[in-house]
Amino acid sequence: MEKNYYVCTGCGLLCDDIEVESEKNIINKVYTACRVGVAHMKKAKGETNFLVNNKPVDEATAVREAASILKNAKNPLIFGLGTSTDETQKLAIELAKKTNATLDDTSSFCLGPLVEALLQDKLKTCTLEDIRNKADVIIFWGADPSDSHPRHLSKHSYFPRGSEKQKGWEEERTAIAIDIRKSHTAKICGNYFFQIPPGGDTEFIDALIAALSGKLPKTSYNFPPKKILELANILKGAKFGVIFAGLGLIYSLEDLEPVFRLMKILNEKANFHLVPMVGHYNMRGFNENLFAETGYVNRVKFEDGMVKHGPEYSVVESLKAKTVDAALIIGSDPLSSLPRSVSKN
């Protein structure tokens, strides 16, 4: 029996304290991991078989066939890489250059805009270690880490004691949830759960900005002004605040302008940071690697040494336009993450 420490790639937390017992390359027991991590690691098997036309082949034949397809393609697409290593991502970028391919990942239809804003220094961010050691006000906005990242609250954001938070969550941390339903995370936040209607995030942000500015907050859905004023007072007192932004927030907004306005006034009144609730364990890595190479986090097209960027180069728009004649999918499953009407193309 072999026992060692491993990094779990079940979500974006990348917990590095996982103990695993394995025998003959089969994982028998997983310790320390959450339910998501245990399921993720136990389903791990040996290397995938190589197939060409649904028939088993050796590795060399598979590589040769894939290379031939890409070489002969007029408009190839490389997609995925959110569950790939940095080294793989950098090689994929070089391959996209060589084949004049469109290159994109799942961030183009989820948290990509937020990550890009962080990399462009338009929003202030921090590390999970900073949050564990310093955070006193934590907001989960359109996010439910109790289900999506089960060790988030216990290991990083709310329950643990940190170097500057020795008294723990009972006395030194305030957790707030803003969401359309009472999630498991919202239940932990207790009275600091602010339930808004679907699509109501922009109005709530405007009302919160008004409250932070000393004005009476108003919403068309009649959210109690007293509760918004109470929230504003908590935020103004934050010494190290953080907003964990999830898909529930991003999908409600037409653009990031309300987020920019909120973060601006929060940092005039207090000290606030924003962290995207990334699901795939290395989506952020792909965004950073592509940004370092091209200045963009996704939706790029390489063409004769030039880089083009725009919504038309997203995986969704490329497939809808039916211009892709070959696709290399790496570490992703477009059939599960894209609408059937798009992925079938």
Features from the language model and the residues they span:
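N-terminal export/assembly segments and adjacent metallocofactor-ligating motifs
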Residues: 1-211, 247, 323
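A short, well-structured juxtamembrane/interface segment
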Residues: 56-71, 223-234, 311-318
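Glycine-/small-residue-rich active-site loops that bind phosphorylated ligands and cofactors
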Residues: 83-84, 250-251, 334-335
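A generic secondary-structure signal marking the coil-to-beta-strand transition
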Residues: 174, 239-241, 326
